[in-house]
């Protein structure tokens, strides 16, 4: 009996010490779990504020939001590049966000109107081409003005600009679905060429104000034939704000021309997406076509020398700053201007 009782005997002192130690460790673990997020937050804050790649810069830069899609893309890209160049944070106005954000994955933050009204802005006018003085623009609170849309401002950041103007998935997929369904004489095309024909108000403004012309039937025939001579079974996807004129003046008898755009200037996402998803571009005049070609990449044909030498338009516009050097120009026919 004594031997059995002895075998079940357990010292109380060590047992109490064990329970106390285990309890202490458990409560310490619980406390560490509760305070761990605070430690993590402090570490993230420290990394964010001390990182040399994201300094807290003084001031605020923005730009006017004027014109339609092509103009505002040029304004956005110019603000993006010049603010970076001058070491200032960039913000876009709400109306620019409303134009671009439904189409593209832009990242610049929005400056709300209530905030903008309280800021002592310094307006700084830009020409439509890069100048050395724009690398050193003075002022902490600067509003850039003008109609800048030149690769000379932002082409050194091409990869970033293309990323800013990445189409939303649903916009891109709708365009690609349409293109996949196209056929040239029963066969799937090997090459897709976007064709943008700018008409609208330019039909009257160019000859009457700027001593210039818009693209005519002859130019478009030459441009399409240029691609036909170099690519097998191309398809030409035509977008325009003058689709009726295009149907009458672009020869579609070969079965390789598709009049795809809806030509609605107020909702240009569909037309623009179709053009950018093509391999190459035929453009006429205007920033819409310039940006479509810039985003599409590939080879681009454009209408060259479409104003008289004494045109006042050339005081505001430099062709060499608008069209990339590798793009190919076809001379405009200025004879209609010379008759008057």
Swiss-Prot record:
Pathway: Protein modification; protein glycosylation. Glycans are attached at residues 185, 251, 279, 305. Residues 29-340 are lumenal. Its EC number is 2.4.1.69, 2.4.1.344. Keywords: Glycoprotein, Glycosyltransferase, Golgi apparatus, Lipid metabolism, Membrane, Signal-anchor, Transferase, Transmembrane, Transmembrane helix. It is an enzyme of class 2 (transferase). Signal peptide: none annotated. It is a single-pass type II membrane protein. One of its GO terms (cellular component) is Golgi cisterna membrane. Residues 1-7 are cytoplasmic. It is found in: Golgi apparatus, Golgi stack membrane. InterPro entries: Glyco_trans_11. GO terms for biological process: fucosylation; glycolipid metabolic process; oligosaccharide biosynthetic process; protein glycosylation; regulation of cell adhesion; regulation of endothelial cell proliferation. The chain crosses the membrane at residues 8-28. Its main location: Golgi. GO terms for molecular function: alpha-(1,2)-fucosyltransferase activity; galactoside 2-alpha-L-fucosyltransferase activity. It catalyses: a beta-D-galactosyl-(1->3)-N-acetyl-beta-D-glucosaminyl derivative + GDP-beta-L-fucose = an alpha-L-Fuc-(1->2)-beta-D-Gal-(1->3)-beta-D-GlcNAc derivative + GDP + H(+); a beta-D-galactosyl-(1->4)-N-acetyl-beta-D-glucosaminyl derivative + GDP-beta-L-fucose = an alpha-L-Fuc-(1->2)-beta-D-Gal-(1->4)-beta-D-GlcNAc derivative + GDP + H(+); a neolactoside nLc4Cer + GDP-beta-L-fucose = a neolactoside IV(2)-alpha-Fuc-nLc4Cer + GDP + H(+); a neolactoside nLc4Cer(d18:1(4E)) + GDP-beta-L-fucose = a neolactoside IV(2)-alpha-Fuc-nLc4Cer(d18:1(4E)) + GDP + H(+). The keyword Acyltransferase does not apply. Catalyzes the transfer of L-fucose, from a guanosine diphosphate-beta-L-fucose, to the terminal galactose on both O- and N-linked glycans chains of cell surface glycoproteins and glycolipids and the resulting epitope regulates several processes such as cell-cell interaction including host-microbe interaction, cell surface expression and cell proliferation. Preferentially fucosylates gangliosides GA1 and GM1 in the antrum, cecum and colon and in the female reproductive organs. This is Galactoside alpha-(1,2)-fucosyltransferase 2. It comes from Sus scrofa.
